[in-house]
Curated annotation (Swiss-Prot):
GO cellular component, one term: cytoplasm
Domain of life per record: Bacteria
Name this polypeptide is given: NADP phosphatase 2
pH dependence: Optimum pH is 7-8.
Keywords carried by this UniProt record: Cytoplasm, Hydrolase
Subunit and partners: Homodimer.
EC number per UniProt: 3.1.3.-
A GO molecular-function annotation: hydrolase activity
Major subcellular site: cytoplasm
Species: Arthrobacter sp. (strain KM)
Protein localization: Cytoplasm
Amino acid sequence: SIPASQKANLGNQMIMAVACYQN
């Protein structure tokens, strides 16, 4: 299972990638 902190980090990276893609 993935630790919560690592899961949150992956989520943040995905959000940043989407934000960069939309800009």
